[in-house]
Amino acid sequence: MQSQKDRLTADWLTLAQSKQPLSAIEAAEIDLDHVLAALVSGGEEIDVPIYFWNVGYPYLQSVSKTEAISLKDTATRLRDIEFPLQTLLSTTLQGVFVISGLLNDFASHQKLYQEISNAFYTLKRNHRSRYIVLLGDSIDVSLPLYPLLPVVRFTPPSKTEITNIVLASLLENQYESNDELKRQLVQALSGMPYGEIEIVLRQMFSKVSEVALMPGFALAYKREKLKGRGIALPAEPDIDRVAGMDELDRTMDKIRLLFQPEAEARGRRPPKAVLLWGIPGTGKSLAAKLSAKRIGGTLVAADWNSLVGQSVQESMANINHLLDLVDSSGTCVLFFDEFEKAFHGWDSGVQGGVLGKMAGKLLSWMQDHTSPVVMIATINRLNLLPAEMIRRFEYVHFFGSIHAGALHEVFKIHLDKNFRYDFSFKEWQILLREYRGCTPAEVAKAVQHVADDLYFRDIKSGEFTPDLPQLELAILIAERRTFTPASSQREISDQIAEIQNMAEYAKPVCGPDQSDFAVIDQPLMGIPHSGSAQKIKRAV
């Protein structure tokens, strides 16, 4: 399999041999030596030297490579020169001139626009072995310059390449490898550029001596780095499933199977996007986070507002980095919470049109990407999402008020973690009736409060033991009296009603209540409702 470095050499050579004298390479700053090494290989193919310059060097640098890249001053001074490209082209030097940083202010610099255009035509007319490569970490070429300045992208290494790097590093540092260690390290390093992987591995081997702790070091580095760019790698939730969501479970199981190699053999592919929509506090975010665990992929959470930078260039660099990260992370879930907030004013030119450009980039990626990534977004208000965005979601699930059977499952999950209890069927009926209309989040909070109260009681009485405390129904009922469910508050209930009125646009996360706690559908004036021939349940 061809490495990214070999591909860069081949792509640039193709441009050079097709008489394209001017090009750009988009690469991470940390990968400079890798880019120069690839161009040195390309230069050897066509027998031309490589030169490099950025504003930190007074003179143009001659590039050579033996064991590593080395730079040496030439006689050509470029610092403090307004038009460095024209200065280069006025010399007698021949070769490949790699200029870094010139495109940083490209969008707002009319003189630079003209200089690049002039450089293209000068190179084209002279018919000499001279090439200019403009290097930047985020390149956005305007339409008029697009045919003059083709862009080659030097992307992070593939998982196969990272595996080879990891194995070589473990061997060099005299550590034995095993499949689990290799898998965890590759997962933690995925999405990083070559140069950054090398730095992280060097730091890891110098600071961590215990093999089992090595993946954690790499992952901690990655988390800290991404945090400043609006990206997080959340820890796995402390529960295995979201209760009472049988229909959503079926969808997630389908998606899991569509990520299997057998699906590709049949020409099937996983969905590109799933939308979880509905009432606040119903478990949308938790369901999205658990989906990564269910599918067996990496969870990458993004905060849209934090992706917006101080400039269009910074903002586009952030979203490009995010999409490159998930595309190179193997099986992955890209998670956006409260996604509708990202599109407030997106088409109105707010913030210089940056929101529109970012949204356009995401829309294009959702449509075109072929990597094993599913985007899962949660929203409260469907009407705040643009129609062209809604169309990109292949599955839309609605989270509404949960029925008695689902509420019973929610209680079971939280009670089993915190208490010993033995409720009779009648006691369960009483509990579910008291908490009817509460969201899963409100149930979880109530159980947590009761667990805290029992802990405080036992500590103060001197009767504390590490065993789970015995729970009585009356304590949970008393806790219910201390709060008003959101669904009962006028302002919030109106918002919930508005959300539920649009629920027909999506598939509910739970099907009909088939539990023993299902509420009997009471007939009107003795006339059964249509479809009421289903099994009669015990009334709550």
Residue map of PLM features:
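AAA+ ATPase "lid" subdomain C-terminal helix
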Residues: 189-215, 433-489
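Amphipathic alpha-helical segments of the small helical/lid subdomains adjacent to P-loop NTPase cores
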Residues: 165, 175-192, 424-427, 431
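C-terminal engagement/docking regions of AAA+ P-loop ATPases
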Residues: 2, 6-15, 229-290, 324-328, ...
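A short, basic N-terminal segment
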Residues: 1-20, 47-50, 60-61, 220-228
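Conserved phosphate-handling catalytic cores of large alpha/beta enzymes
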Residues: 170
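Conserved ASCE P-loop NTPase core motifs with emphasis on AAA+ ATPases
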Residues: 210-241, 340
